[in-house]
A protein has these predicted regions:
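N-terminal beta1-alpha1 cap of cysteine-dependent amidohydrolase-like domains
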Residues: 1-84
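Structural motif
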Residues: 5-6, 86-88, 119-120, 156
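Short glycine-rich anion-binding loops that position phosphate/pyrophosphate groups of nucleotides
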Residues: 10, 41-43, 90-93, 123-124
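Short amphipathic alpha-helical segments
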Residues: 18-19, 49-50, 97-100, 131-133
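Short beta-strands and strand-loop turn motifs
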Residues: 36-39, 88-89, 153, 157-158
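Short, hinge-like loop/turn segments at secondary-structure boundaries
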Residues: 53-54, 85-87, 135-139
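Flexible gly/pro-rich beta->alpha loop and the following alpha-helix that scaffold active-site loops
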Residues: 64-116
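Class I SAM-dependent methyltransferase SAM-binding "motif I" and its flanking Rossmann-like core
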Residues: 97-98, 105-160
Length: 160
């Protein structure tokens, strides 16, 4: 059974990163000591490390550690062994391109479908659908396919 939270945004006006979601995330990820973070969407072009640090600071407030997938030599094993997964927002074209480039899109879909708790915000939500073709993001890079995870049977536009 899938265990997913699909959020349109990570930050509400006048609040901190993930602040509005933290009560729900503490329940959603209650059995997780460490979350695997996928920072590939890189909002405003920040580095994977900067984005991971930002997300880790938020999760620390609910006593959950976070580690970026880019820190692993084998991202497929990291996904298969993850207690929980969070894909952050940013540019959907960049995110999907990196998921294909790192050959992890199928594994990510499989672990979510098998019940690993998942959080997606913005672009991380868009990829839950069948394709990314509803995104409003600028096409800054051309992914090899517009097909995404298909963990829900429809497409999402996170910022309609």
């Amino acid at each position: 059974m899938k265990n997913i939270i699909i959020a349109s945004t990570s930050t509400l006006h006048d609040s901190g990163y993930l602040e509005y979601l933290l009560p729900d995330l503490s329940v959603h990820f209650k059995d997780c000591k460490t979350i695997l973070f996928i920072p590939y969407a890189r909002p405003s072009g920040i580095t994977h490390e900067e984005y991971t640090d930002k997300a880790a600071t938020a999760f620390a407030k609910i006593n959950i550690a976070l580690k970026g997938i880019h820190e692993y030599e084998d991202p497929i094993s990291a996904l298969k062994n993850a207690e929980g997964i969070f894909t952050g927002g940013g540019n959907t074209f960049l995110l999907v391109t990196q998921l294909y480039k790192n050959n992890i899109i199928t594994t990510l879909a499989d672990v979510i479908k098998s019940g690993t708790p998942y959080l997606g915000t913005s672009a991380g939500s868009v990829i839950c659908g069948l394709s990314m073709q509803n995104t409003n993001d600028m096409p800054i890079i051309y992914p090899p396919s517009f097909q995404t995870l298909g963990v829900i049977p429809f497409n999402i536009n996170a910022h309609y």
